[in-house]
């Protein structure tokens, strides 16, 4: 995103021969992508997976029959199916299990240890039940956690580190992440368990704690729920469970782990095919030969696939990666490689949807505009087929809003103007690009999206506004951390300090992080509350926001994709499980 700094690059004519990105180049050569070969899509693997699904369903029925600890066993089953990424095969079983648990759920006390009739309320079972029920949109109150405080109003634990207690604290930590605005007890639970679990990992007296459980604790602290996307979580938990010998003693658990590995590899094989189509599309385009922008089409594919991985959303994923690639080209053009006058002409060309308006601009800008029109028109035609109506006017209006926000930033830079924080955030939400990125993808998820439903999931809906705000805050917060080292200031930080001269840069950064924390809680609420929007649409938008938290966890993973981001790509997209 454009930085509010003493930059004169947009006020002077640029030498076209010197137009080159200062970021590292493409890491994923098309020849390498096309060379990805795997037999995991062969019929025998699909047949084995289908057989395992049926075996596990039968084992579920058998193990739950006349079970003395039926509530906790059902919750553990739901949790492991979800952590291993195979829950889509057992939606009926999960629904039945949670309906059963909810029948015995007490809003003030939770559920008991052992059987459903137990009067002894259990910390672990209640926290696990709360998390599962809330994520599946049952009405559960966080007040239930008040039961597990002492007379001083603090959560309690023993002075010794025991495996059962570590498990309880881990479960409570995971539950506390699904909080809504104003839930003080959830904030208290998160602070308490974070401190406890951190001490467990750094302590020396943990010999009585299973190493597999310690790996779970390490994962939970390093990758909290809002950056623990389904594919990332599945790969990580498959590896954790595979090292847990005591867990693997169960026949059912062995079958579950075998299915999880098989399912992961089958999906990865399908994702290879999509990645190859995407790579061919990019490498065969004229824009591929230009060097002024970040070439990150594979990274953008990872962003979407870690959250929306199901086979039926193939077109949605490829579209998401294409639009992200296009937006990055525009981002780098408006940020660095176009003069203000050139950008005004480019923006007007988009408003009129007219290639002739850019005839007199440099070749790299004309190539960019032609790539923009070709890509947009191709996808608009695809949308018309899927939605059974012409959506071009709606889509074009969204592009206008996006590029007008970029142009506003370019004008601020050219004038050396630092806007107020509110002005910056209002414009920055639009320039985040989430509006156009989510629009194409939602329209190509394979379901009809009537106008009234579209208004509830896209702009100006609350959930969409929160996704846009998340993108802006994540980007600005990480820009501050990484760019202040080189003497540059991330825009939101600088604007806040201008409005509040008594604040330090760290104060401003903390303010943005506080806004992000509140935004996450509001997103949780929008995600789980019942309305007329199909859950698949909500999950998509929600996981796009969560994906940014993972990609920006250590640094801007799009700017610098040759470190953690590269590792993520190999883990999720390249290397199969063995």
UniProtKB/Swiss-Prot annotation:
**Main location class:** cytoplasm
State how the cofactor is bound.
Binds 3 Mg(2+) or Mn(2+) ions per subunit.
Alphabetized, the UniProt keywords read:
Cytoplasm, Lyase, Magnesium, Metal-binding
A Pfam family of the record is Terpene_synth_C
Tell me which cofactor or cofactors this protein depends on.
Mg(2+); Mn(2+)
Q: Which GO terms describe its cellular component?
A: cytoplasm
List the subcellular locations. Cytoplasm
Q: Where along the chain is Mg(2+) 2 bound?
A: 331, 335
Reactions catalysed, semicolon-separated, are: (2E,6E)-farnesyl diphosphate = longifolene + diphosphate
Q: Which SUPFAM superfamilies match?
A: Terpenoid cyclases/Protein prenyltransferases (SSF48239), Terpenoid synthases (SSF48576)
Could you say which protein family the record assigns here? Belongs to the terpene synthase family. Tpsd subfamily.
Q: What is this protein called?
A: Longifolene synthase
The taxonomic lineage of its organism, from the top, reads:
Eukaryota, Viridiplantae, Streptophyta, Embryophyta, Tracheophyta
């Amino acid at each position: 995103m454009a930085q509010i700094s003493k930059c004169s690059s947009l006020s002077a004519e640029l030498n076209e021969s010197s137009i080159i990105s200062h970021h590292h180049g493409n890491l994923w050569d098309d020849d390498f992508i096309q060379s990805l070969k795997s037999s995991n899509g062969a019929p025998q693997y699909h047949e084995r997976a289908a057989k395992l699904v049926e075996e596990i369903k039968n084992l579920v029925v058998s193990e739950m029959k006349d079970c003395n600890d039926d509530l906790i066993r059902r919750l553990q089953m739901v949790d492991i199916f979800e952590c291993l990424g195979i829950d889509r095969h057992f939606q009926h079983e999960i629904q039945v299990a949670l309906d059963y648990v909810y029948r015995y759920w007490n809003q003030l006390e939770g559920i008991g240890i052992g059987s459903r009739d137990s009067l002894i309320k259990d910390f672990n079972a209640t926290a696990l039940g709360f998390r599962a029920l809330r994520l599946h949109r049952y009405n559960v109150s966080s007040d239930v956690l008040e039961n597990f405080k002492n007379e001083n109003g603090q959560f309690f634990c023993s002075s010794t580190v025991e495996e059962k207690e570590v498990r309880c604290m881990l479960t409570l930590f995971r539950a506390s992440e699904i909080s809504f605005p104003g839930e003080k007890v959830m904030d208290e639970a998160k602070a308490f368990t974070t401190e406890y679990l951190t001490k467990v990992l750094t302590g020396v007296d943990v010999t009585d704690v299973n190493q597999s459980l310690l790996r779970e604790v390490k994962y939970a602290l390093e990758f909290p729920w809002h950056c623990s996307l389904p594919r990332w979580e599945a790969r990580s938990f498959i590896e954790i469970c595979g090292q847990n010998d005591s867990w693997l003693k169960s026949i059912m658990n062995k079958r579950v782990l075998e299915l999880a590995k098989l399912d992961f590899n089958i999906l990865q094989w399908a994702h290879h095919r999509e990645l190859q189509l995407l790579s061919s599309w990019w490498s065969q385009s004229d824009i591929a030969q230009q060097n002024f922008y970040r070439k990150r089409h594979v990274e953008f594919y990872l962003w979407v696939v870690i959250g929306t991985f199901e086979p039926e959303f193939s077109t949605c994923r490829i579209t998401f990666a294409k639009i992200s690639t296009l937006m990055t080209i525009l981002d780098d053009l408006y940020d660095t490689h176009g003069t203000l006058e050139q950008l005004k002409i480019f923006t007007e060309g988009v408003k009129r949807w007219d290639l002739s308006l850019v005839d007199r601009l440099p070749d790299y800008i004309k190539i960019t505009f032609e790539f923009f029109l070709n890509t947009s028109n191709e996808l608009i035609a695809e949308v018309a087929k899927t939605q059974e109506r012409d959506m071009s006017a709606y889509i074009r209006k969204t592009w206008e809003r996006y590029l007008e926000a970029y142009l506003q930033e370019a004008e601020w830079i050219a004038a050396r103007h630092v806007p107020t924080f509110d002005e910056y955030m209002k414009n920055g939400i639009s320039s985040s690009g989430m509006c156009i990125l989510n629009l194409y993808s939602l329209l190509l998820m394979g379901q009809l999206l009537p106008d009234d439903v579209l208004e509830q999931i896209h702009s100006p809906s609350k959930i969409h506004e929160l996704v846009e705000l998340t993108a802006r805050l994540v980007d600005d917060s990480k820009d501050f951390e990484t760019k202040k080292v080189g003497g540059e200031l991330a825009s939101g930080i600088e604007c806040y300090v201008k409005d509040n001269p008594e604040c330090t840069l760290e104060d401003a950064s903390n303010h943005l992080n506080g806004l992000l924390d509140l935004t996450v809680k509001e997103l949780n609420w929008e995600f789980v509350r019942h309305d007329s929007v199909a859950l698949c649409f909500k999950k998509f938008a929600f996981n796009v926001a969560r994906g940014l938290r993972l990609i920006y966890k250590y640094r801007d993973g799009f700017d610098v994709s040759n470190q953690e981001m590269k590792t993520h790509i190999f883990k999720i997209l390249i290397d199969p499980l063995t």
